[in-house]
């Protein structure tokens, strides 16, 4: 929440690039961490889920363009984080998906809704019900990502893309509206 709050309060912001400095974007939650969570009361679980949703919604609602650079695996909650960005650029070797559904856990941070708005209900249903990890080319075909590049070019394209948004060459405001 502090990162989102810092971005919201920054008067000089023009755009946000979301990127991991590690080999992978975000693997998502460690499923073993869910065991103690599921032992909590229904109210405590709702509070946790709503809190995470609130943070992601605030990021999605930023008044500047946002781009996620997916440099490795972005799975489960990690992919849901990518979906909150206005645009997603993916490395050729990266993979995305919602594998938690194989365990009977539905995406809890808005991923189901965001993916269906971005890629269409048919593709979202396939992704959610399969729990499959998807290659970059497949994600691009269903519009789950906006571009696929060699990993060495990811940062460069991300910078160029956000600058095009800031300069008004890409209508990022329209994209925000389309995702709602």
Question: Residue locations for each model-derived region?
Answer:
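Hydrophobic, secondary-structure "cap" segments at the distal end of domains
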Residues: 112-122
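A structural preference for short, pocket-lining loop segments at secondary-structure junctions
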Residues: 1-42, 54-69, 91-95
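Hydrophobic/aromatic residues within transmembrane alpha-helices
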Residues: 18, 30, 81-82, 139
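A glycine-rich helix N-cap at a beta->alpha junction
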Residues: 45-46
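Amphipathic alpha-helical segments at domain termini/boundaries
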Residues: 127-180
């Amino acid at each position: 929440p502090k990162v989102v709050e810092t971005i919201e309060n920054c008067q000089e912001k023009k755009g946000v690039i979301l990127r991991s400095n590690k080999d992978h974007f975000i693997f998502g939650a460690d499923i073993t961490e869910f065991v103690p969570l599921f032992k909590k009361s229904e109210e405590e679980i709702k509070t946790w889920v709503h809190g995470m949703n609130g943070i992601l919604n605030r990021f999605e609602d930023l008044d500047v363009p946002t781009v996620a650079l997916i440099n490795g695996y972005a799975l489960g909650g990690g992919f849901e984080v990518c979906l909150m960005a206005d645009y997603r650029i993916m490395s050729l070797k990266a993979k995305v998906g919602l594998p938690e559904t194989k365990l009977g856990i539905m995406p809890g941070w808005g991923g189901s809704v965001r993916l269906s708005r971005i890629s269409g209900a048919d593709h979202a249903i396939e992704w959610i019900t399969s729990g499959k990890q998807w290659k970059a080319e497949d994600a691009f075909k269903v519009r789950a990502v906006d571009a696929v590049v060699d990993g060495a070019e990811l940062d460069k394209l991300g910078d160029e893309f956000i600058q095009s948004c800031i300069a008004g060459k890409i209508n990022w405001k329209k994209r925000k509206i389309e995702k709602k």
